[in-house]
Amino acid sequence: MNDIKIRFGNKLKKLRKEKTDLSQESFAAQIDLDRTYYSSIENGKRNVSLVNLEKISAGLGITLSELFSDIEKE
């Protein structure tokens, strides 16, 4: 079973590409996060705070529950 951070990062990358078609840099700037910090989340290397999860979900136009749906299945 993959680490939860890796599974979440994979889901986040997929959603970013599907919902925004923006690069990591452009999306991070849009939601007011540092690009390297955001990249490390997508790569499963960092934990993320609730405040930043809210920024990410808003930037993707989805709810927090949608952000976490199906992570266990990946």
Curated annotation (Swiss-Prot):
Source organism, top-level taxon: Bacteria
Keyword terms of this UniProt record: DNA-binding, Restriction system, Transcription, Transcription regulation
Gene Ontology CC entries for this record: cytosol
Domain HTH cro/C1-type: residue ranges: 12-67
GO molecular function terms listed in the Swiss-Prot or TrEMBL record: DNA binding; DNA-binding transcription factor activity
Annotated DNA-binding residue span(s): 23-42
Pfam families associated with the record: HTH_3 (PF01381)
GO biological process, one term: DNA restriction-modification system
Entry function: Probably controls expression of its associated restriction-modification system MunI.
Protein name: Control protein C.MunI
Gene: munIC
